[in-house]
Amino acid sequence: MHSTDTIVAQATPPGRGGVGILRVSGPKAAVVAQTILGKVPKPRYADYLPFRNEDNSVLDQGIALFFPNPNSFTGEDVLELQGHGGPIILDLLLKRILQIPGIRIAKPGEFSERAFLNDKLDLAQAEAIADLIDASSEQAARSAINSLQGAFSSHINEMVESLTNLRIYVEAAIDFPDEEIDFLSDGVIEGKLNTVISQLDDVRTQARQGSLLREGMKVVIAGRPNAGKSSLLNALAGREAAIVTDIAGTTRDVLREHIHIDGMPLHIIDTAGLREASDEVERIGIERAWQEIEQADRVLFMVDSTTTEATTPEEIWPEFMARLPSTLPVTVIRNKSDLTGEPAEITSQGDYPMIRLSARDGMGIELLRSHLKEAMGFNSNTEGGFLARRRHLQALNTAAEHLQQGYQQLVYAKSGELLAEELRLAQQALSEITGEFTSDDLLGRIFSSFCIGK
């Protein structure tokens, strides 16, 4: 057990509802039960009881559940009081519980943090709880459930076990240098190392899919005024999210829409038309547009095809391309093909994909949807997949770098000591995902992002 105090919080969302739940965890959970209920319910059995105030008057009535340690979510004694979901009733009951000495309000994510600290789940599973609550699509929810049930962690634990065994073999090579068999050159270590590298590559691929499901893709629509940017936003969103007129400069601020393409979250951002600003309001809008462009995963460069026959971005607008970050992916959208008679199609112009479409009548929109999925490497078949966060990707990439460095030390430098160190660092990076090696500061940041009752 890592804590001696007892915490309480509302486990259901704020507001009115049919049921409201208060959760208590810690060594005084049984004291709370005795005080509020007049008894400690039989473990893991639902008991319908009155919830009593200090003067023995009834505050509410409902179901009480008691889970003695270690067989509870947090690994501590846990009491759940399930009453009516009125905010006044729940607040009165919460105040009554807080009158009991040694009880305090839980910090955000503290229940999950205690479950982690008491080895009821690892850090990746704890994060999956928050991801399940925040899931924005059915696929994201399924993947979060998989993570909660240990799908991600099992991959990590398997690789950590493989690295442990490999380190033992390498240490043997270091400790017995005079053996007839040259451990570093017999091919066994290289074969084992390649197996772990291959395992890690597979997990990184799955993790990138999981990150897409969780984080989504930020796409910024940019171009000159009246190119059809807002019409494209509306076409992708499937509703009139932006005002569309023939007047150039109608959009003066950033507009955001959140949609899904076969389960992939897509954050679409419509920006003000880029030109020399005619007033201060438009200038601010254009500056905000550039801020969004520079933070995008991909830019849809909108071109009014009735105004130019040029197809490469540098020909169409050299000043725009000169300001773009060189690593930022760009897709050219030649809009208004309904007016030019151009067929809806996707081609490439140099390094840039180009899509001819009509945002107004929807022609070519499905081509764009498919292109965005393909550009991000998204696979809608995520059976057995898991969600991943940016910190997970960073840890996996760090581990991959150390394994590649280790391979160089093995094959070219023939250095067992340096190989052993790279294997240790790779193992440490992987263990940060499940929380085996994680700083208290990182734990605080992770769990503080949870809701209060989790």
Swiss-Prot record:
A single GO BP annotation from the record? tRNA methylation
Domain TrmE-type G, chain residue ranges per copy: 216-377
Q: What are the binding positions for Mg(2+) in this chain?
A: S230, T251
Its predominant location is cytoplasm
What residues does K(+) bind to? N226, T245, I247, T250
Q: Name one Pfam family in it.
A: MMR_HSR1
One annotated Gene Ontology cellular component of this protein: cytosol
UniProt keyword terms in alphabetical order: Cytoplasm, GTP-binding, Hydrolase, Magnesium, Metal-binding, Nucleotide-binding, Potassium, tRNA processing
- What EC designation does it have? 3.6.-.-
Per the record, the coiled-coil ranges are none
Identify its protein family.
Answer: Belongs to the TRAFAC class TrmE-Era-EngA-EngB-Septin-like GTPase superfamily. TrmE GTPase family.
> NCBIfam families, per this entry?
mnmE_trmE_thdF (TIGR00450), PRK05291.1-3 (NF003661), small_GTP (TIGR00231)
Question: Subunit structure of this entry?
Answer: Homodimer. Heterotetramer of two MnmE and two MnmG subunits.
| Free-text function comment from the UniProt entry | Exhibits a very high intrinsic GTPase hydrolysis rate. Involved in the addition of a carboxymethylaminomethyl (cmnm) group at the wobble position (U34) of certain tRNAs, forming tRNA-cmnm(5)s(2)U34.
Name of protein: tRNA modification GTPase MnmE
Q: Which organism is it from?
A: Proteus mirabilis (strain HI4320)
**Protein encoded by which gene:** mnmE
